[in-house]
Structures are given as C-alpha cells and as structure tokens.
C-alpha cells in the first residue's frame, strides 16, 4: 500500500465500528497516525490490534462527543501529543429502526440530533482551532443518503443528516482562506455489522433489498473509507463544500 499519508495526523470519530472503523484501517494502511474516539473500549482494543497487524498504529480515546468538554479534552491531547491535525473524519452517527414521525419519542429525537449533528459540530469546532494554527486541514463529515432522498420512517434521521450537509456547505466558507477544506459524504445502504446480522436473520428481505438497488448490492464500509481518503488527498485541495453521494446509483 502506498504510504501517501505518512507523517499526517488524522482524527476519526466513531472509530470502533462500521464506517469509522473502516476509515481508521484505510488511513493506517496509507501511513497516517490515527487518533479515534468511541464509547466501546473492548471494540476499540480490537481496532488497535488490527491496526498493528496492518503495520501501523492507532490511538483510542473514550469520548462522548455530545459533551463539548469531552471533545475539548481529546483535542487538547492531540495538540499536546502531535502539535497538529491534518485530517478529520467525523463519522460517528446513530439511527433508529424505521419509525413514523408521529411515533418518534423525545429521547429518540434528542439522541439523533445530539450525536449526528451537535456532536459533529463540537468536533468541527475543535478540529478547526488546531488546523488554523498551521493553515492546513481536511475535514470530511458523514451525512446520509436519507438527507437527499425521501423515504418513510426516516424523517428525524434525515433531518439530523441534512443538518450535516448544511453545516458542511456553510462552514467551508468560514475556513476556506485558512487552507482548510470541508466536504461531506452521503452513503447509501452500506453493509455494516447491523446489516450483516440482518443478512442471516432476514435473508429474503436482505436479498430483495439488494436486488432492488440500482447497482444490485449493498456498499461496503471500505468504499466509504476510500471516499473519505479521496478528500484527504493532495489532488483534492480545490474541492470544498461538496456533498458526495456514495450510494450505488440512488
């Protein structure tokens, strides 16, 4: 693997599973030093062990990104330990099973807004502070195809992820003269751990959904990780404020 990111420091939220974990692995393969956050210490250790197998290293910090002070503490550590931050992938997110909007509870609304939007904004605030110190940075936010395509039972999730797209398209102007780009990715249906479990427990539904997708299959987490790294590459320096769908044609 080309070590194109050797010497670069990267931060990933939600790095203990799914798209975040795949992004940590891809960055390590490309030579970056990675700090990732999450809430599951056992899963984090598995990620760290895998990174060592890949010939790199990653550091983990337990962090609830919905608490701004927790986020401040993590980025204080990054500043002290590394003195800079080159890349940031704000991947952490949550959802609920398909739920009609009038059946959605207050707790569900709070959870999705707090994690998907407020937590992401807290991370961006601290990322930008460090990046401005060195007039360089690449930020990628994970939104969702739900923000762009209507579907039943997805209203609150879509609202939180549409907020991510909105933050991306506007925050990019605040930092564009500081050498910082801000872009987002809207994944379609991706075969995360949750989808893999459905693959076996609801095989017919899984097969039907896959066949109805334009490309005929679910996406893989690695394909989203490749998209994140695309925005981190030097060749993408002129791209900012873009929301890139990676959704197999949806």
Description of each model-found segment:
Residues 9, 16-17:
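Conserved glycine-rich cofactor-binding loop
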Residues 72, 95-110, 133, 153-156, ...:
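Conserved mid-core segment of classical short-chain dehydrogenase/reductases
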Residues 102-122, 136, 140, 164, ...:
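Catalytic Tyr-X3-Lys loop
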Residues 32-46:
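Conserved glycine-rich Rossmann-like NAD(P)H-binding loop of the short-chain dehydrogenase/reductase
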Residues 129, 173-177, 237:
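Alpha-helical segment proximal to the catalytic Tyr-Lys
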Residues 136, 217-246:
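C-terminal substrate-recognition "lid" of short-chain dehydrogenase/reductases
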Residues 124, 160, 168:
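Active-site helix of classical SDR
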Residues 144:
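Residue(s) in the substrate-gating loop at a strand-loop-helix junction
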């Amino acid at each position: 693997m080309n070590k194109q990111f050797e010497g670069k420091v990267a931060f990933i939220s939600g790095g203990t599973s799914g798209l975040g974990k795949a992004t940590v692995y891809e960055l390590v393969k490309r030579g970056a030093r990675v700090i990732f956050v999450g809430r599951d210490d056992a899963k984090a250790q598995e990620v760290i062990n895998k990174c060592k197998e890949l010939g790199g290293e990653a550091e983990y910090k337990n962090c609830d990104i919905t608490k701004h002070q927790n986020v401040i503490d993590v980025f204080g550590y990054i500043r002290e330990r590394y003195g800079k931050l080159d890349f940031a992938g704000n991947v952490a997110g949550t959802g609920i099973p398909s739920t009609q909007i009038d059946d959605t509870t207050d707790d569900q609304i709070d959870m999705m807004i707090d994690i998907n939007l407020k937590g992401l904004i807290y991370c961006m605030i601290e990322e930008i502070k460090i990046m401005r110190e060195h007039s360089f940075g690449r930020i990628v936010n994970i939104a969702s195809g739900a923000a762009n395509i209507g579907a039943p039972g997805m209203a609150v999730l879509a609202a939180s992820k549409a907020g991510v797209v909105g933050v991306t398209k506007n925050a990019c102007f605040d930092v564009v003269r500081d050498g910082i780009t801000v872009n987002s990715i809207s994944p379609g249906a991706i075969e995360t751990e949750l989808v893999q479990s459905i693959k076996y427990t609801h095989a017919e539904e899984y097969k039907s959904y896959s066949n109805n997708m334009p490309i005929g299959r679910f996406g893989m987490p690695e394909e989203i990780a490749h998209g994140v790294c695309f925005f981190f590459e030097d060749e993408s320096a002129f791209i900012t404020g873009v929301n890139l769908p990676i959704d197999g044609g949806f």
